[in-house]
Amino acid sequence: MRECLSIHIGQAGIQIGDACWELYCLEHGIQPNGVVLDTQQDQLENAKMEHTNASFDTFFCETRAGKHVPRALFVDLEPTVIDGIRTGQHRSLFHPEQLLSGKEDAANNYARGRYSVGSEVIDLVLERTRKLAEQCGGLQGFLIFRSFGGGTGSGFTSLLMERLTGEYSRKTKLEFSVYPAPRISTAVVEPYNSVLTTHSTTEHTDCTFMVDNEAVYDICHRKLGVECPSHASINRLVVQVVSSITASLRFEGPLNVDLIEFQTNLVPYPRIHFPMTAFAPIVSADKAYHEQFSVSDITTACFESSNQLVKCDPRLGKYMACCLLYRGDVVPKEVNAAIAATKSRHSVQFVDWCPTGFKVGINNRPPTVMPGGDLAKVHRSICMLSNTTAIVEAWARLDHKFDLMYAKRAFLHWYLREGMEEAEFLEAREDLAALERDYEEVAQSF
């Protein structure tokens, strides 16, 4: 088996996790209590006869009673958000030990998440992680969900990643991170938290898929016609991307991509590991009946900034690597034609040291949408993961905000009070300046 453990940290990580497992259950025919629907049960039995290791088991563990339990852990330093899962629709899906919450929150403070409050729960979290890992025949790695801007998401995650590297050094660690949006901010100190956590986790993560709320908010508003998108609307779009990335781990397919393959194909140098995500088609239910989306259409759409889940202009950068993950009614011949057309367009530029650049995954299971959600059901979809130098725009924006506050030493006392030193801020900021330079260097011709 090649199991994956998902760890959902802080408010953003948990809310995305809740939506994620809701979608996985729909895709696999698992009811909110963990029991497989009868029709799916027959298919599952047949699948298990055909494949002794049904891909299904990479994300779910089957108990003796025949219940399917997610291989997941939810962690927060305060109980409010996790209590929502404990009392929500999927409360019977998870074992109580998978839902871990502390008594006091990190108060949007990296230092509290990493040092003071976080240090009190880290051993318990690692113990629960060990329990989940012991249930795996061949753990391939971790999927970590969090935000850069929150105290728990930034601080506690960096502490946990460090410890996971110590205990599971050979395992792949992929992150899904909510990056601070250019104009929408949930906390004034987001730039501090984001710079500190990027510095402290860079060497402990293999690949970080970034999403920003403003980009997703705009997509929901513009393409789905949602007047004021809620967190639920935003998360349901984000989890379509997560589902596309993990589909090849959960379903059999002709051109499937393994966890370690993402890293191998997307990360040319260890530090350059922040791919952007894009998704197509994004269409509302009332428009879907009037439009047909060919493989060529959806492939073209993915290279447009309006379909990307991070605010930056891909035309300003060069692509180093690109992973195209198709789902549904897609054949390789059409994909090859779409890629050839993309390469002929001048707006899509690759660095000269990586002229081929495309990795393709095809999974024949069509995408599933949430009933009553904003997205329409479609026959085929694409998720694009691209490592492009254009992402440097996002880092530059973040560093600028950090500099404005740090020049006045604004809000610094909250961090120093928790035991941090100014030197840590300077070191983190220097590391991000180096990251900007790294991206600029790889874009240059030899």
UniProtKB/Swiss-Prot annotation:
Binding residues annotated for Mg(2+), in chain numbering: 78
Modification after translation, per record: Some glutamate residues at the C-terminus are polyglutamylated, resulting in polyglutamate chains on the gamma-carboxyl group. Polyglutamylation plays a key role in microtubule severing by spastin (SPAST). SPAST preferentially recognizes and acts on microtubules decorated with short polyglutamate tails: severing activity by SPAST increases as the number of glutamates per tubulin rises from one to eight, but decreases beyond this glutamylation threshold. Glutamylation is also involved in cilia motility. Some glutamate residues at the C-terminus are monoglycylated but not polyglycylated due to the absence of functional TTLL10 in human. Monoglycylation is mainly limited to tubulin incorporated into cilia and flagella axonemes, which is required for their stability and maintenance. Flagella glycylation controls sperm motility. Both polyglutamylation and monoglycylation can coexist on the same protein on adjacent residues, and lowering glycylation levels increases polyglutamylation, and reciprocally.
PROSITE patterns: TUBULIN
Record carries keyword S-adenosyl-L-methionine: no
Active site: 261
Major localization class: cytoplasm
Matches recorded under InterPro entries: Alpha_tubulin, Tub_FtsZ_C, Tubulin, Tubulin/FtsZ-like_C, Tubulin/FtsZ_2-layer-sand-dom, Tubulin/FtsZ_GTPase_sf, Tubulin_C, Tubulin_CS
Binding locations of GTP: 11, 78, 147, 151-152, 186, 213, 235
Cofactor: Mg(2+)
GO terms for MF: GTP binding; hydrolase activity; metal ion binding; structural constituent of cytoskeleton
UniProt EC number: 3.6.5.-
Ubl conjugation found in the keyword field: no
Reaction catalyzed: GTP + H2O = GDP + phosphate + H(+)
One Pfam family linked to the record: Tubulin
Similarity comment text for this entry: Belongs to the tubulin family.
Record remark: domains: The MREC motif may be critical for tubulin autoregulation.
Protein role: Tubulin is the major constituent of microtubules, a cylinder consisting of laterally associated linear protofilaments composed of alpha- and beta-tubulin heterodimers. Microtubules grow by the addition of GTP-tubulin dimers to the microtubule end, where a stabilizing cap forms. Below the cap, tubulin dimers are in GDP-bound state, owing to GTPase activity of alpha-tubulin.
UniProt name for this protein: Tubulin alpha chain-like 3
Source organism (scientific name): Homo sapiens (Human)
Organism taxonomic ancestry: Eukaryota, Metazoa, Chordata, Craniata, Vertebrata
Gene (UniProt): TUBAL3
